Amino acid sequence: MKIIIAPAKIMKLDRDSFPVQSTPEFLKKTRILEKFLKSRTRDQLETLWHASDKVVEQSLFQLKNMDLDTNLTPAILAFSGIQYQYMAPDLFTQPALDYIQKNLRILSGFYGMLRPFDGICPYRLELNTKMVGFRDYSLYHFWDEDIANSLFKEDQVVINLASKQYMRLVKPYLNSARRMITVDFQELKNDKWKTVGVHAKMARGEMVRFMAEKQIKNPADLRDFHDFDFQFVPEVSSDDHYIFRTDFDFTRH
């Protein structure tokens, strides 16, 4: 069983907490993207990144200093978004760390797919970037079926804790031998059950930690997850779509 999550836009360096253990599986393809980005002018990169001046400056600095082989940070520590903060991998026990290295995969527009202890460097390249001037019109086309093939090489089931944008790297390539279970976290807003992005990211991070601590191997055991008072709702769930709902007051958290 594999678990997929999305990366975070905010990245940091951390070479002290845990050592790098592995090399990204698709590093050869990442070098192609690196070469393309470094061949672009500042104006072309501004168009590509479509970001604020501050973010563009940071991204240019990252790109100028990019080295895919040295001074690397384990992927699980390199991303510092909400999901990763609530996952809190720096507090994991060794069995939990071993569990995520084996089972957790971080999807990425730049690296394709990462194990938690793959060594990476900071980058900016969102999956939905319009790749003007590149050999492929989109990163979905560039990565094609590579990621799905790798995910399902040893496992028939993938737990999807990624965003809709990133699950598109996998969903088109499902078949009768490939099962993906999407987990959805909902709250009651204006008398309708909705997914609130920030709170869903918090819950996804907590669920990864729950799975690692409990060494979850059976998807059905995910139903025992209750952080933020989330409860599995069988009446609205299906075999491939697990829905959790809560009335937790996030404003007091």
Swiss-Prot record:
Q: Which residues form the signal peptide?
A: none
> Which InterPro entries does its entry note?
YaaA
**Pfam families according to UniProt:** H2O2_YaaD
A GO CC term? cytosol
Which cysteines in this chain are paired by disulphide bridges?
none
Example GO biological process:
response to hydroperoxide
PANTHER family linked to this entry: PEROXIDE STRESS RESISTANCE PROTEIN YAAA, PEROXIDE STRESS RESPONSE PROTEIN YAAA
Protein family per UniProt: Belongs to the UPF0246 family.
Q: What is this protein called?
A: UPF0246 protein LBA1843
Phylogenetic classification of the source organism: Bacteria, Bacillati, Bacillota, Bacilli, Lactobacillales
